[in-house]
Amino acid sequence: MHYTTAAEAVKLIRSNDSVYIQGSTSIPEALVAAMAERGGELEHVTVYSAFAVGAFDAPYCRPEYKESFLVNSLFVANNIRRWLADGYGQTIPAFLGEIPALFRDGTLPLDVALINVSPPDAEGYCSFGVSADLAVSAVECAKTIIAQVNRAMPYSYGDAVIHVSRLAAAVEVDSPLVEVPTAVPSETERKIGSYIAELIPDGATLQIGVGGIPNAVLAALGGHRHLGLHTEAMTDGVLPLLESGVIDNSQKAVMPGMTVASLALGSRRLYDYMDYRKDLVMKDVAWTNDPFRIRQNPKVMAINSAVEVDLTGQVCADSVGMRIISGVGGQHDFMYGGALSEGGKTFIAIPSTTPKGESKIRALLSPGAGVVTTRHMVQHVVTEYGVAHLRGRNLAERARALIAVAHPSVREELERAAAGRFGYSFLRLKA
């Protein structure tokens, strides 16, 4: 395969093109930096940026490039949050699993895809490694594919491969992948994790996210048997369960025996575990996040988080008031699929307060807050004070259950709000 420089490769990008940039822990940094260097000669290039982690700043968002690059974020992450807050870009609200369809049906047309892949195997196939998610559909739809071929990228199977013949240009690098440190659960998070673990049966299929609470849940599952993993994001937290055989995927209906994910957010240990592993597949996020595929697995345990929850069970997970801080991701997809799964359960797991001491359970969502998961599919809300069981309960009963797991300092205030809203039907319920 012929390699070129990043500066030469991005000359394939022209004014008025639309460009997809691969995200998660797999940003093709050399290509993105080289594209930004061309800012002075490019005009009206539409950039679709995906979820991203790490310290890499998004240079194309800078004010001096406001006429060069028109930024549409598919998931607001740290690298572009401040630029979007200042008006140098916008976000497209969409379920993560829906975005591939937006590429495929031309709603979001793509001229160029900038991707980060492994070196080719003996048959000429490179792997997306840690990030299949949106990259699979992006390279399917883009007219021009420019690849950063990274020696540090693990080779994963599933949908995550592309033949070198499809690459318009390739740049060879040996650049460490972004690593996401394992979050050590706090005492509060360990309590929440233990409550959830008690409700997970043997033979369950897990969908679990990133952070202290998910890690606390996983750490509490060592005594379980025959768990499965069908998730959007895979982290280091699953490794002990995979290596000990607690997760053996034997009871899954969809790809039994296989660990299924769409992206990986972890350490080098996780990436090395993935390398050429035949019992692990990285899939198009439209496939992993399809609620009607998710529901086919037995006992799906969908475990997600929130910015805030109101007294009826509505969940805001992507904004603080009007300020967008992340994206919908796959929360709705897995909460829906989990609710439909035979024996499935859905959880919203949150500490009762923010680091500033503000309650995360509120009478009403903050003005401007978006509802990511509706009250109709939230079955359990878990804090360090216990589990609010919401499934099948009326609104007044939900309010009483949620107040019981709110921080004690706000319960009286929430009781007054609930009494004013629901009247006698709330007051008759015992605290």
Residues covered by each model-derived region:
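Conserved alpha/beta enzyme-core scaffold
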Residues: M1-A431
